[in-house]
């Protein structure tokens, strides 16, 4: 069987200028980065402001399993199928992080016949956006320590420096480090923790900013430390905002690429959904909505993580309102949620499908809690049987049902998602969405967390550690109680325990810590043992990546 990379390389891509023209982007507004990728000029984007928005389709998954769900693949297949059906459609996705590419998950450009391309360029350096974000983040960290070194005019308390350095790599050795060792010329020694770039506040700001002015306002609001009197220190105090914005200026223009079938795709920004808010940039999404009648976008992991954050954070801040949600699952993954071992997934097991469907039903219910009509997309495998598909239909009918479409876009491209595209078109036309965020702005922070835990995760309650309770109370006293909350939690379960698959009941969600992201405009609550700097697995994917004698990359997936 051909690999995703082989399929991508065998496809004939169109010059990026042709893709731009098909999307309604004039040649003078395209900034080419080679033959097959480019950026969209910010001035052109501003000129679109008065155009009406198209319909927004949000794609989410179930709780992920090692069997894979294919959410990005489905987003791409749906976009291609909508285009094939005659709709003026675009796709808006996140950029991949190097950490997962070299770690366990692999890249994030889809799979099979449903990919965005050029695959290896997008998965690796792409247009340099993540380098710019990492550089801006670490410039701020350097200027902060430099200020303390040169006399500390602002009276920063070194014990209350909160801002972290970042790197776009899975590197557990950087979770807890000590800076400034050696003589005094290296600065004062202090503890420092690193985040992966996609979990940093600068990444979140990049993805939530509406334009360069908004970007600078948000950067200026980051709380990097506290003075000895407890007052906050910001990049504005350190005179760092201008230089950070200069590093981010070009990166803030969204990236244009194409699917293997030539559908225009804006791929821009990439916060993780388990340890950050998990959505592509507001600028890319809004640009696509001005250019297309239907925009397909995704949120990371399940409805409980990226889905909830897309709707409670991104939509709240950007004024977006999806027309419907698509929840992606596989029959194989549902079997795993019922306890079937990965080695046994190929054997027919309708009973396991019915039991595992409880996880899917909870994700469907989560999207309905926001007033969205839901379509279920089953990403098909050759091992799926008719009996298993019927068992799934029956299981979904238990809760009033959801429209279900069985898809084969991995193997067949747009032709394999025709039914899904038609379901989306009909759902948009019905105008049945009644979108509303899950909680009001004026709800207290612990109550916002409790609302998410009970209505989305199915928990009985939350349990705040003394540290988390203290920090949430402090944030409220400082005037941040109006902000939405961003829960950092394992993606593998509705609980904080990654081993509890399916749809658990009778549990509480432990909140061990909280962080303020004043620039991004939310409060991060850390549930369980989730970490904001991942590590590599025992056998990282990087071991299989290399170059052939002609210099072509192999081993990416």
Curated annotation (Swiss-Prot):
InterPro entries: Formate_THF_ligase, Formate_THF_ligase_CS, P-loop_NTPase. Its EC number is 6.3.4.3. It comes from Acidiphilium cryptum (strain JF-5). ATP binds at residues 65-72. The gene is fhs. Signal peptide: none annotated. SUPFAM superfamilies: P-loop containing nucleoside triphosphate hydrolases (SSF52540). HAMAP family: FTHFS. This is Formate--tetrahydrofolate ligase. Belongs to the formate--tetrahydrofolate ligase family. Keywords: ATP-binding, Ligase, Nucleotide-binding, One-carbon metabolism. The lineage of its organism: Bacteria, Pseudomonadati, Pseudomonadota, Alphaproteobacteria, Acetobacterales. Pathway: One-carbon metabolism; tetrahydrofolate interconversion. It comes from the Bacteria. The keyword Ribosomal protein does not apply. GO terms for biological process: tetrahydrofolate interconversion. It is an enzyme of class 6 (ligase). It catalyses: (6S)-5,6,7,8-tetrahydrofolate + formate + ATP = (6R)-10-formyltetrahydrofolate + ADP + phosphate. GO terms for molecular function: ATP binding; formate-tetrahydrofolate ligase activity.
């Amino acid at each position: 069987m051909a690999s995703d990379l082989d399929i991508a390389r065998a496809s004939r891509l169109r010059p990026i200028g042709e893709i731009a023209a098909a999307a309604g982007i004039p040649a003078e507004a395209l900034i080419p980065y080679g033959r097959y990728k480019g950026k969209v000029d910010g001035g052109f984007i501003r000129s679109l402001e008065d155009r009406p928005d198209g319909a927004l389709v949000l794609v989410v998954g179930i709780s992920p399993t090692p069997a894979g769900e294919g959410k990005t693949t489905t987003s791409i297949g749906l976009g291609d199928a909508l285009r094939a059906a005659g709709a003026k459609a675009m796709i808006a996705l996140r950029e991949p992080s190097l950490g997962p590419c070299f770690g366990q998950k692999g890249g994030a450009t889809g799979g099979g016949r449903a990919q965005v391309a050029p695959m290896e360029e997008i998965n690796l350096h792409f247009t340099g956006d993540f380098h710019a974000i990492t550089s801006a983040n670490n410039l701020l960290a350097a200027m902060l320590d430099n200020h303390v070194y040169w006399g500390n005019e602002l009276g920063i308390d070194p014990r209350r420096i909160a801002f972290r350095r970042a790197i776009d790599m899975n590197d557990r050795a950087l979770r807890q480090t000590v800076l400034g060792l050696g003589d005094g010329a290296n600065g004062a020694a202090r503890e420092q923790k690193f985040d992966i770039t996609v979990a940093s506040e600068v990444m979140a700001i990049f993805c939530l900013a509406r334009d360069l002015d908004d970007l600078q306002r948000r950067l200026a609001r980051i709380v990097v430390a506290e003075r000895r009197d407890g007052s906050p220190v910001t990049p504005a105090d350190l005179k760092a905002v201008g230089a950070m914005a200069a590093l981010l200026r070009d990166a803030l223009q969204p990236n244009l690429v194409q699917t293997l079938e030539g559908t225009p795709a804006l791929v821009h920004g990439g916060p993780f959904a388990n340890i950050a808010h998990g959505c592509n940039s507001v600028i890319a999404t809004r640009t696509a909505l001005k250019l297309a009648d239907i925009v397909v976008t995704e949120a990371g992991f399940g409805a409980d993580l990226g889905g909830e954050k897309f709707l409670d954070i991104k939509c709240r801040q950007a004024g977006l309102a999806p027309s419907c949600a698509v929840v992606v699952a596989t029959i194989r993954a549902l079997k795993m949620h019922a306890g079937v071992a990965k080695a046994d997934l190929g054997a027919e097991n309708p009973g396991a499908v019915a039991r595992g469907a409880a996880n899917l039903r909870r994700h469907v219910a989560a999207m309905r809690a926001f007033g969205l009509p839901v379509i279920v997309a089953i990403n098909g495998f050759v091992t799926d049987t008719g009996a298993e598909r019927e068992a799934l239909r029956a299981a979904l009918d238990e809760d009033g049902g959801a429209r279900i479409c069985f898809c084969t876009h991995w193997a067949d491209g747009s032709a394999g998602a025709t039914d899904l595209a038609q379901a989306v078109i009909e759902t948009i036309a019905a105008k049945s969405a009644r979108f509303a965020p899950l909680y009001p702005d004026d709800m207290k922070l612990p109550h916002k967390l409790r609302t998410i835990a009970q209505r989305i995760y199915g928990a009985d309650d939350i349990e705040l550690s003394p540290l988390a309770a203290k920090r949430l109370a402090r944030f409220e006293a400082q005037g941040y109680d109006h902000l939405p909350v961003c829960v950092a939690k394992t993606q593998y379960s509705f609980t904080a325990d990654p081993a509890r698959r399916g749809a658990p009941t009778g549990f509480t969600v432990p909140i061990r810590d909280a962080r303020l992201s004043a620039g991004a405009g939310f409060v991060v609550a850390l549930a369980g043992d989730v970490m904001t700097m991942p590590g590599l697995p025992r056998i990282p994917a990087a071991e299989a990546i290399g170059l052939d004698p002609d210099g072509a990359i192999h081993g990416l997936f």
